[in-house]
């Protein structure tokens, strides 16, 4: 499995020293990173850092305003650093109007990004499994976005919402191009990959159209770097 790390997982470390943190991610063995901020570096500096550490950019998590207000700038930055995706990590989807606004923004940005061979995506939490007009909000998003817009499915949050991640991955098939590998236990806590209830091997097998598997870890019962290393080792042995 080609394993990358969502850098938000180590945000307390990147706040101290962004470059050294990224270097440590590479030293552990991760193949790529997904950004949630750039440590005040320019696009050229980020590109140089990736080259120095032999990492690639899966993509970036950018707020919805980056799609609606500053997408040309967002796209240019991600083109420079070699991103494959630009992902919206959260949006309000409690009403049909909010979903429509999100879908329109993603479709418009996706069409523009496609000209640079970059795709746009949406990353779920649990609130997208609210029922809106008799359907899950995430289903409405998936149904109404075009082929330039994909799902980055966070399996922790799918399970947290009471949905089987494997069945949900199969439901959307080709739409699911990225998986957030994030483990959950019986108490709905985020734990090391090896210590939870989700079978990541079966999830990988179900996600037959997914190219990128991105570790995200937000709750820690041990030093951060120990957990990040544990996750990599568990997945690399898969």
Task: Please annotate each region the language model reported.
Residues 39-49, 96-105:
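Active-site-adjacent beta->alpha loops and helix N-cap segments on the catalytic face
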Residues 42-61, 109, 116-118:
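Short acidic, glycine/proline-enriched helix-loop-strand junctions
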Residues 45-49, 73-74, 164-171:
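A short acidic, amphipathic alpha-helical/loop segment
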Residues 53-66, 184-185, 189-192:
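Acidic/glycine-enriched edge-of-secondary-structure segments
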């Amino acid at each position: 499995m080609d394993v990358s790390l969502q850098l938000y997982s180590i945000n307390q470390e990147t706040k101290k020293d962004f470059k050294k943190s990224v270097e440590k991610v590479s030293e552990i063995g991760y193949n790529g990173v997904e950004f949630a901020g750039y440590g005040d570096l320019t696009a050229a500096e980020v590109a140089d850092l990736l080259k120095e550490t032999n990492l690639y950019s899966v993509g970036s998590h950018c707020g919805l305003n980056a799609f609606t207000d500053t997408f040309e700038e967002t796209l240019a930055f991600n083109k420079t650093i070699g991103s494959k995706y630009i992902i919206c990590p959260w949006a309000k989807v409690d009403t049909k109007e909010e979903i429509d606004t999100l879908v329109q923004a993603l479709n418009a940005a996706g069409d523009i990004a496609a000209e640079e061979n970059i795709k746009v995506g949406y990353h779920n939490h649990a609130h997208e499994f609210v029922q809106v007009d008799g359907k899950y909000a995430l289903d409405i998003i998936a149904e109404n976005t075009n082929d330039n817009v994909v799902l980055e499915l966070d399996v922790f949050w799918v399970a947290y919402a009471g949905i089987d991640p494997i069945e949900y991955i199969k439901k959307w098939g080709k739409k699911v191009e990225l998986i957030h590998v994030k483990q959950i236990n019986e108490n709905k806590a985020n734990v090391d990959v090896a210590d939870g209830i989700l079978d990541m091997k079966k999830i990988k097998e179900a996600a037959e159209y997914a190219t990128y598997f991105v570790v995200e870890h937000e709750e820690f019962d041990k030093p951060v770097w120990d957990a990040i290393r544990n996750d990599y080792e568990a997945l690399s042995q898969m």
